[in-house]
Amino acid sequence: MEYINKKLNEFNENIKGKKVAIIGLGVSNKPLIEYLYSLGAKITVFDNREQEKIDTDIWDKVTKYNLKYYLGEGYLANLKCFDYIFRSPSCRPDLPEIEAEINRGAILTSEIEMVLKLAPCKTIGITGSDGKTTTTSLIYAILKEKYKCFLGGNIGTPLFARISEMKPEDIVVLELSSFQLMNMELSTNIAVVTNISPNHLNVHKDYQEYIDSKANIFKYQDENGILVINYDNEITKDFAKQANGKVVYFSRREKLPNGVIFDEDTVKICDNDLRRHVINKKDVKIRGLHNIENICAAIAATKDLVSPEEQRQTIMEFTGVEHRLEFVRELDGVKWYNDSIASSPNRTIAGLNSYNERIVLIAGGRDKHLDYDPIAKPIIEHVDTLIVMGETAEKIKNAVTRELENQKKTLKIIKVANVEEAVKTAREIAKPNEIVLFSPASTSFDMFKNFEERGKKFKEEVNKL
């Protein structure tokens, strides 16, 4: 008998003729616009950019459907008398114009929140300051061998228009950022928090708001919910006190009686006296102890859904995700790695700790108001030459210089204007058996649209050499 999603059918009927505001014309909202338009919603779109900065693909939909639009400065002045407001992750939910509409009776939601509300199947959400994408990709890779899976959120494809394809036995896997979770009042069935450290403090009001946003991934679970958290991180460990359902810990450092641990170079599932070996470190292709943590998280999230043997097989074949310690090429005995995803000092520290070779490090980008002092010691320990660029160049240089003075050591630090100059400089100074690591410890927005564009530019310049 064919499955009928009653909740989806009710929504589809209800949205017909309703006034819908879509805030943010990112490419991910294109399927949302198409779907809501097909249902007969009266759509108005809003974006703080001018038209020439909006992707032509999505702007073509605005003109094709003859949608009302408001762009640029003061773009929300006409946000009035709407039934639904769909916000993109880059738009804060507490803007005065949005709050005024909510107080008037509008429903504030998002593509992700509607997926959680209307999907008829199990949902797994992954968040954290670092390791989200690798952990999400691993969970998806492990489960898709046995289940029909849908991958969405920060990676994969927008899923709102695909809810009609979902059946109760399927699984939705979502990578969720603090911006997506910010005003969320629904949680995933299984919630994974990889770790929490200061991040995006240029957007969030303070660190507590960032932490609270992350906590929404499990806050609304019932007693059947599962929360997978990092025992080695003080903040995620503390989340256990707020959990409504079952808590599953993973740890790289502690020998826990229950949960997923890394012991004797092996990832193990522990259930009191029963210990099941999943995979040995030598069989893992992705580098770094931080990736062992990501593997532990993925195993903890999927251990009730697949066997350890099925987990092992997928993990053995997993080669990682683009822009995450990605090998680019070897030239004259020097290996080049792209770690453009590293938008925080913690990410770069994890990258530095992944190599035994001496490193030429390229770092710097947009300033997120983070503390760069913690990165100084790992740089001095692993790096022969530091190349800095972007808004954070001076902050990184100053942090390292202070620590060099403390240790009475020296390190060559070179400031450059851009990625192209950084690659040329690294080519001139890197010696055989060294590696060049592009790990910015900063976001990309001072020079690029996103970290993907930044990483592609780095690879392009390296491959020109």
Which residues are covered by each model-predicted region?
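Beta-strand->loop->alpha-helix junctions that form or flank phosphate-binding loops
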Residues: 72-73, 109-113, 244-262, 312-316, ...
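C-terminal helical cap/extension that packs against the catalytic core
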Residues: 59, 375-434
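Nucleotide phosphate-binding/pyrophosphate-handling subdomain across enzymes
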Residues: 3-19, 29-39, 148-149, 279-385
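Residues in the short beta-alpha loop(s) of Rossmann-like NAD(P)-binding domains
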Residues: 26, 49, 155, 232-233, ...
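Short beta-strand "acidic-cap" motif of Rossmann-like dinucleotide-binding folds
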Residues: 43-47, 150-151, 173, 249, ...
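N-terminal leader/targeting and accessory segments in enzymes
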Residues: 1-110, 114
